[in-house]
């Protein structure tokens, strides 16, 4: 038999069972405080060091000794993120937390796990209504309203959801791990093809490229400057009349018009930008050691901070697109680069062009490209299906939590 329901008066909650109430978060705790900024020099990988919540998805460790004694987490605390993703943590006791975290000292009678489930739904409604909101203040958290059943029913709901969510999380973890394995497989398939070819019966010879070992006997090794020319054409056409191109480590070369939204600094004009033609290779000199290199499928312009290379005769740019995005070639870029920190590690044009690469006959380059296009497409389609499954399962998990913490569905008594 379905329960008698009533309107809660709260948009995200909707109707609740007649015997339930609603309550603001501010009435469930006895006070709030923020943590302390802890310098990265005190961050640690030692498993025996103190846990430190940083507003990331999981805590890290710290050996910092001067965290105020009264701020260490206690058994009845919840931690709430102030910035970024609005995570809600049930912390381990005696943990530290950054000043980007709010600690709420919960009332002794409160079921923290039920509150966590309810707050997750409540704060999600704020995210949907205000996607640009960057800060989750104490005032905002205190205003959150959740549905409030009896203590006994809260306990039943928590036990039910903990079991269901643990199973869902296990499936999600396995699926994410399988995606990483497919990515590794793709990288292995590419590396094998661009360094060994796709003919199993060919004779091989030693390679002078450190990470390759052996290459097919008919292949050569040649410096990049001997197969690609440095393109230095500048653009002076107004921004609104050009095809603006960007380079991403994961995605390669993308047209701005194909992006749903652009992040970071936006160009205000394209004067002095570098011209790019179809089949050119674009290189980010700062991040090429992380794979920020790619072929352009388009004519357009790109940032003057990037290098642009055009292929010479008997060079298939797509072959080198695959080759340049291997981890082996990334290590070549790193060895030739220099800088004061990893994210500012530059492989300048002269150093990049001096790197030796394999050089198969053009016919083989094209055969390898055709082979890799097919294989990579197969792997990418499998990954897309798994990502879609993850999206659906995460949506199901959120719906499941919502239905039970608002009383739309009832956990049976046993």
PLM feature spans:
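Non-catalytic DNA-recognition/assembly elements of restriction-modification systems
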Residues: 3-36, 52, 147, 151, ...
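Short, solvent-exposed loop/turn positions at domain surfaces
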Residues: 10, 66-67, 130, 173, ...
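Short, well-ordered beta-strand elements within core beta-sheets of diverse protein domains
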Residues: 11-15, 102-106, 142-148, 210-214, ...
């Amino acid at each position: 038999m379905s329960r008698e329901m009533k309107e809660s008066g709260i948009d995200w909650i909707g109707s609740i069972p007649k015997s339930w109430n609603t309550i603001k978060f501010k009435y469930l705790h006895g006070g709030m405080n923020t943590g302390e900024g802890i310098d990265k020099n005190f961050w640690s990988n030692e498993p025996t060091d103190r846990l430190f919540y940083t507003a990331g998805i999981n805590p890290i460790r710290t050996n910092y000794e001067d965290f105020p004694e009264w701020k260490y987490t206690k058994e009845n605390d919840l931690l709430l993120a102030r910035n970024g993703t609005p995570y809600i943590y049930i912390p381990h006791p005696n943990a530290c937390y950054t000043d980007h975290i709010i600690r709420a000292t919960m009332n002794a009678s409160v079921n923290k796990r039920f509150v966590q489930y309810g707050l997750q739904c409540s704060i999600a409604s704020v995210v949907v209504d205000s996607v640009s909101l960057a800060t989750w203040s104490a005032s905002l958290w205190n205003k959150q309203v959740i549905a409030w059943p009896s203590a006994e029913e809260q306990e039943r709901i928590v036990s039910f959801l903990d079991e269901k969510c643990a199973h869902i999380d296990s499936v999600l973890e396995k699926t994410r791990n399988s995606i990483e394995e497919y990515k590794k497989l793709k990288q292995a398939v590419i590396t094998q093809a661009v360094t060994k070819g796709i003919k199993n019966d060919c004779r091989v010879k030693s390679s002078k490229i450190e990470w390759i070992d052996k290459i097919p006997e008919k292949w050569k090794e040649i410096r990049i400057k001997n197969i690609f020319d440095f393109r230095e054409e500048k653009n002076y056409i107004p921004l609104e009349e050009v095809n603006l191109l960007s380079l991403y480590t994961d995605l390669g070369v993308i047209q701005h018009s194909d992006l749903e939204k652009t992040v970071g600094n936006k160009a205000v004009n394209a004067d002095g930008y570098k011209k790019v033609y179809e089949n050119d290779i674009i290189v980010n000199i700062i991040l090429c050691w992380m794979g920020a290199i790619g072929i352009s499928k388009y004519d357009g312009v790109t940032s003057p901070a990037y290098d642009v290379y055009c292929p010479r005769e008997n060079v298939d740019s797509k072959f080198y697109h695959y080759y340049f995005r291997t981890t082996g070639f990334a290590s070549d870029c790193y060895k030739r680069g220099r800088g004061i920190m990893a994210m500012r590690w530059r492989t300048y044009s002269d150093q990049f062009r001096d790197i030796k690469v394999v050089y198969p006959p053009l016919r083989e380059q094209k055969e390898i490209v055709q082979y890799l296009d097919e294989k990579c497409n197969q792997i990418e389609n499998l990954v897309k299906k798994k990502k879609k499954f993850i999206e659906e399962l995460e949506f199901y998990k959120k719906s499941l939590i919502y239905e039970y913490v608002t009383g739309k569905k009832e956990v049976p008594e046993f």
